[in-house]
Amino acid sequence: MFACDELLLNASTIDATGLQLYNQAIVIRKGRIEWCGSEDQLPVHFQESAKSRKDCHGQLITPGLIDCHTHLVYAGHRAAEFRLKSQGVSYADIAKSGGGILSTVQMTRDASEEELIDQSLPRLLALKNEGVTTVEIKSGYGLDLQNELKMLRVARQLGDMAGVRVKTTFLGAHAVGPEFKGNSQAYVDFLCNEMLPAAKNMDLVDAVDVFCESIAFSIRQAEQIFQAAKNLNLPIKCHAEQLSNMGASSLAARYGALSCDHLEFLDENGALNMVKANTVAVLLPGAFYFLKEKQKPPVDLLRQVGVGMAIATDSNPGSSPTTSLLLMMSMACQFFSMSIPEVLSAVTYQASRALGMEKDIGSIEAGKIADLVLWSIKDSAALCYYFAYPLPHQTMVAGEWVS
């Protein structure tokens, strides 16, 4: 009888705050971390009776990376709009001519589930190939009952096909469905009374998100949706304070939000309310870069008051067409002046908190699922130093090496 399935020796690791630890050992048993700590404190019975052992030669092991904010299920692309923007055409003019989010909605509606899988699976596999083991995927390009459910079904299937843990978020409140043009309140009522309960009844949704902004949904409408989610025992998230300060972060915190995302215009009151609610700030440097934003999220304020910060790709066709979480990590350092430990924690422990999964994943601790990445580097700073470079690595998911 073996004491463990796998024994990883002579490794460096990171703790939940992103600090690097050296001379570490990790014991894996039945898909979970049985023990971890300094190698000189490793219990003798694990040393003497391990089914398999690996000398890591001082290389870095991190938790499996977590992309906690994506919109990667969609059809088509918006490269033509990118060309127009490069020629000086405004987003408003593009939207008036039928472009913008509603163009993606139409292409996604027109696509079958099989076509959505064919187009979206490569995006998920690209994340997996960077050491990402858990991904959040939002709906929001259907904007009617049939197509929102279609997107959520595809997201579930993608996780099974790619061998990646997928958490689904219902984002019917991404924009007003075109059938309800000029009557956003009727759309919100339909969303709360029909769409969200159907997604819940089919077990397709893990959380509920709202884009609360002057160009999307009002504070009052966001609260109506949050209350509907609460009535269904679903946790909430919020696209908040991206373009202006509407108080969405404080509202979301009042409902115990897992995360508020974007946050370029967050103020101190919103940040303090997020702290009280243990709400994570999810920062999205890809959108900041692609949209040429000038207003940065208030990292110093978040740091000062103690709001946990996560980083994600925001993978989507309109404002962040990327599938590289490693690139986002480098951008977070360069654009947002986050420290190396902050960024490493942002894509592991803090990202797990943003999904409500911190009890199972996100850090190297006894009892947690053994999602790990063994990198071909010894200095943790290298994960943020390189950009657009595929660092060699091996990935373990639930105790099994998958690459």
Swiss-Prot record:
**Is the Metal-binding keyword given for this protein?**
yes
The cross-references to NCBIfam families, in alphabetical order and at most eight, read: hutI
Species name: Legionella pneumophila (strain Lens)
Residue sites binding Fe(3+) per the record = 69, 71, 239, 314
Q: What class of enzyme is it?
A: hydrolase
Question: What pathway is it annotated to?
Answer: Amino-acid degradation; L-histidine degradation into L-glutamate; N-formimidoyl-L-glutamate from L-histidine: step 3/3
Q: Where does 4-imidazolone-5-propanoate bind?
A: 78, 141, 174, 242, 319
Q: Which domain of life does the protein's organism represent?
A: Bacteria
Question: Transcription: is it a keyword of this entry?
Answer: no
What does this protein's record comment on cofactor binding?
A: Binds 1 zinc or iron ion per subunit.
Q: Which residues form the signal peptide?
A: none
Functional summary from the UniProt entry: Catalyzes the hydrolytic cleavage of the carbon-nitrogen bond in imidazolone-5-propanoate to yield N-formimidoyl-L-glutamate. It is the third step in the universal histidine degradation pathway.
Pfam families, sorted: Amidohydro_1
In its UniProt record, which GO terms are filed under biological process? L-histidine catabolic process to glutamate and formamide; L-histidine catabolic process to glutamate and formate
The cofactors it requires, by name, are: Zn(2+); Fe(3+)
The cross-references to PANTHER family, in alphabetical order and at most eight, read: IMIDAZOLONEPROPIONASE (PTHR42752), IMIDAZOLONEPROPIONASE-RELATED (PTHR42752:SF1)
Instruction: Quote the record's binding site residues for N-formimidoyl-L-glutamate.
Output: 141, 316, 318
Q: Which Gene3D superfamilies match?
A: Metal-dependent hydrolases, Urease, subunit C, domain 1
In the record, the note on similarity to other proteins reads: Belongs to the metallo-dependent hydrolases superfamily. HutI family.
Kindly give the InterPro entries that the UniProt entry links to this protein: Amidohydro-rel (IPR006680), HutI (IPR005920), Metal-dep_hydrolase_composite (IPR011059), Metal_Hydrolase (IPR032466)
What's the protein name?
Imidazolonepropionase
One Gene Ontology term, aspect cellular component? cytoplasm
Cite the EC number. 3.5.2.7
Q: Where in the cell is it found?
A: Cytoplasm
